[in-house]
Amino acid sequence: MAMWLDSVPQLKSLGVSNAEIAELTKAHEAGMTDPSSVVLIQLARDHKTPFADGQSVADLLNAGSSEETVLELARLNQLGLWAGEARAMRLAGLSDKMILAVARRRSQGLPVLSGEKLGELKNTGVTDAMILQMIQKGDTDETATKLIAQLERAAGGHRFVYQAHAHR
């Protein structure tokens, strides 16, 4: 076992494989704490799969997502392939709250805006509160495209990028 894992007896009792240790090491090196590492393994056991999302966890943490957000994504079984989109959303300035709202809808099989459209909404100057409301209502990419077009027309027909801080 990796040296840091020797100090986490709960992991030994969960029968962690060498492959899972390698994945946990990636997450740990990105800042995942020991107690959360145990939770990740327990969640993988609950989903009856080996833990294989260490790189996804590391990428999300490195993009600025909180450990709590990563654990909630794991609870929702939304790490895996979707974690890349969640990471891109985070890097585009979307909050963990928005990412979790999208993940909850995805986990329930409900319609949800794509990460790309959410980023466009953010860049067009739509407030976080309005974006969150659109996610929770189940607005589609088509609805978002119409809103973006309206906002661009109102701005004189130009695509523009919202900047939170004026540069002089």
Show the residue positions of the predicted features.
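General marker for long, soluble alpha-helical cores
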Residues: 1-168
